[in-house]
Amino acid sequence: MRPLNVQIRLGNLRHNYRILKEMHGGKLLAVVKADAYGHGAVRCAFALADLADGFAVATIDEGIRLRESGITHPIVLLEGVFEASEYEAVEQYSLWPAVGNQWQLEALLSRHWKKPVKVWLKMDSGMHRTGFFPHDYTSAYAALKQSEYVDSIVKFSHFSCADEPESGMTEIQMEAFDLGTKGLEGEESLANSAAILNIPEARRDWGRAGLALYGISPFGGSDDRLKPVMRLSTRIFGERVLQPHSPIGYGATFYTSKSTRVGLIACGYADGYPRRAPSNSPVAVDGKLTRVIGRISMDMMTIELDASQEGLGHEVELWGDTVNINTVAEAAGTIPYELMCNIKRAKFTYIE
């Protein structure tokens, strides 16, 4: 059997939730969209069932999957519905929809609901994706408030640069949000992972923990308060010694500078490892760091082995405990979200 494995450490997930909940205060949504950032939404949700105040997803299908698996917690649809007919499923499965534009608002208000719905009303405080502009927010809020079909309204927005403290953008967005919601009653939600960790003023009634929930610092590097949940590993299935000036891999982009011991490992870009990861990207053999050499192939890659490192059959960590996923992402010119969400053709093992 091909030895590409993903370990999901559910104990680390629970640890991270507790840390983030303590830091934020109030209530905390566990963001499990995109199959819990590649970790497995159902398994992660059940691991957090006795801790989480609620969950957040991106799509109706993601919410339905949690409900049909037995999750009874509040589930927020962060993007709301994509067509008016989806409000039927919102009601059937007791989901909390975000409303971030006029057609979503009108479709919700024109429907005859059997039971009142809790709405998350989004403001575009400066990211300019979805949400009502601050000068339009009060009228959208008033329309919902006047409806007999609306149970309550959570006011929320999303930060564009919370992981870039020096930008000043988060302060601008918070000011816009506070001015636009002045005098409007109800709960609020502003803090994503970066804000939970670093911006106390953004910690309102509800936090939304995504990346940090899975043990990854949104600021790059590592955060000693968090424990990585995902560990991606494989094994060496081939080994050889190459002479100096030997090319390796497609395009012959890497040449050995000396007699070099190399290992061939079972993971490639078809498994989700980024093809653009350059030579010198870190991996670890039995806990000792080494590097990728040559281009990433579809199904395999080549690593350098020193004289002290074991070879054939030994484990190679691609990211997890020894290899920080942020380091891999930075080397490949991408972000850890993309790496985790792209993993496939791997065996998943869940560790309680």
Curated annotation (Swiss-Prot):
The keyword Isomerase applies. Its EC number is 5.1.1.1. The active site is at K33, Y250. SUPFAM superfamilies: Alanine racemase C-terminal domain-like (SSF50621), PLP-binding barrel (SSF51419). Keywords: Isomerase, Pyridoxal phosphate. GO terms for molecular function: alanine racemase activity; pyridoxal phosphate binding. InterPro entries: Ala_racemase, Ala_racemase/Decarboxylase_C, Ala_racemase_C, Ala_racemase_N, Ala_racemase_pyridoxalP-BS, PLP-binding_barrel. Its cofactor is pyridoxal 5'-phosphate. Substrate binds at R129, M298. GO terms for cellular component: cytosol. The modification N6-(pyridoxal phosphate)lysine is found at K33. GO terms for biological process: D-alanine biosynthetic process. Pathway: Amino-acid biosynthesis; D-alanine biosynthesis; D-alanine from L-alanine: step 1/1. It catalyses: L-alanine = D-alanine. It comes from the Bacteria. SMART domains: Ala_racemase_C (SM01005). NCBIfam families: alr. Catalyzes the interconversion of L-alanine and D-alanine. May also act on other amino acids. Belongs to the alanine racemase family. This is Alanine racemase. It comes from Neisseria gonorrhoeae (strain ATCC 700825 / FA 1090). The gene is alr.
